[in-house]
Amino acid sequence: MKFDCAIVGGGLAGLLCGLALNQYGLRSVIISRGQSALHFSSASLDLLSALPNGDKVTDVAQGLQQLAEQLPEHPYSRLGAGAVLEYATQTEALLAACGANMQGEARQPHLRVTPLGTLRPAWLSPEEVLLAPFAQQHVCLVGISGFADFQPHLAAAALGQHGVTAAAVEIELPLLDVLRDNPTEFRAANIARVLDDENLWPALHAALLPLAQQHDLLIMPACFGLADDRLYRWLQTRLPCPLRLLPTLPPSVPGMRLHSQLQRQFIREGGTWLAGDEVVKISHRQGAVEAVWTRNHGDVALRPRFTVLASGSFFSNGLVATRDSVREPILGLDLQQTLPRESWYQRDFFVSQPWQRFGVKTDALLRPVLGGQPFHNLFAIGSLIGGFDAIQLGCGGGVCAVTALHAARQIHALAGDRP
């Protein structure tokens, strides 16, 4: 099977790279083993929230310049501030084209409300997520009786520290009794599947209406809208006060919806999606990838002109750790960090952990290195790349997006007009 590009990994980085390649008119295939980290994500993306010295970033352009001085090995520092902001703006357009309605812009982070009622900086957030500062003063956090993945009382107490009068209430929804027999089934994703039935929407509206008549704002757990935001918009037009949603413990409905929107758009535009498959081998010679072998296709190899590794970090097995070493499992690529095991972590759990910065070495074009030599037609993107701590710096989503679009641009330039 011949493709212009084979992308290993179907998470945020892989999908954005595939969407960008579609726009360039290149034929690509994504090999996805299963659920990506987006299924466990709030669907809010961060670009750059903090610097290595601990300073908060309020102006991203200025923050990128300071980052280049403090952490020159960061992917942003290597690409340059101008390119990062350009790719971020392009990402916003790609997400909008997929039907993902987001709020925020690249140059200035906003503060979103977390499930615990705290404030966290972000670059983009789904439009139903509550942002600070708050225009409303009398807020009601609405939980669902028996639903343990959202604690309205904790969120209300935290919001109260920001000068908001916040009440916590739980509503009874008998329409969800079908899920209550098994506590493991009473999760946000399963509730969302039940509420996909439009015949049940009036019952939810009836439960929320008395609360909406008494408060300036309702905040619910994001437990509906798995495929789209129709129910959210339906409620918005019928309740007398605004409604906002907060992500729950994983699996996350907003994250699952964002993944589905990107995946559907990729396929709609002509991309090929190999679900439930896994790359077991990549054949290469003299620095060029020749074939990609997958578990499900056996002896039938994919033969792409270019290959992109978007296989993630430890969470997605893009990196694998043994008792005394870390390796990239498909090709055994060179890693940016090779610290002895006793230096992998800090005893203080809340400080930046060295293992978070582990990842593959790449050159300026994001081509990974094997034995000190970069590949000619292989690129690495997203959290597989080393040199940064996404949690400490608040840059995980941004690195995925920026490196994905940078790799797509390099592939387009190298592909030229060849068939």
From Swiss-Prot:
It holds the Pfam family FAD_binding_2. It catalyses: a quinone + sn-glycerol 3-phosphate = dihydroxyacetone phosphate + a quinol. One of its GO terms (biological process) is glycerol catabolic process. Pathway: Polyol metabolism; glycerol degradation via glycerol kinase pathway; glycerone phosphate from sn-glycerol 3-phosphate (anaerobic route): step 1/1. InterPro entries: FAD-dep_OxRdtase_2_FAD-bd (IPR003953), FAD/NAD-bd_sf (IPR036188), G3P_DH_GlpB_su (IPR009158). It comes from the Bacteria. GO terms for cellular component: glycerol-3-phosphate dehydrogenase (FAD) complex. Its EC number is 1.1.5.3. Its cofactor is FMN. The keyword Signal does not apply. GO terms for molecular function: glycerol-3-phosphate dehydrogenase (quinone) activity. Keywords: Flavoprotein, FMN, Oxidoreductase. The keyword Oxidoreductase applies. Composed of a catalytic GlpA/B dimer and of membrane bound GlpC. Conversion of glycerol 3-phosphate to dihydroxyacetone. Uses fumarate or nitrate as electron acceptor. Belongs to the anaerobic G-3-P dehydrogenase subunit B family. This is Anaerobic glycerol-3-phosphate dehydrogenase subunit B.
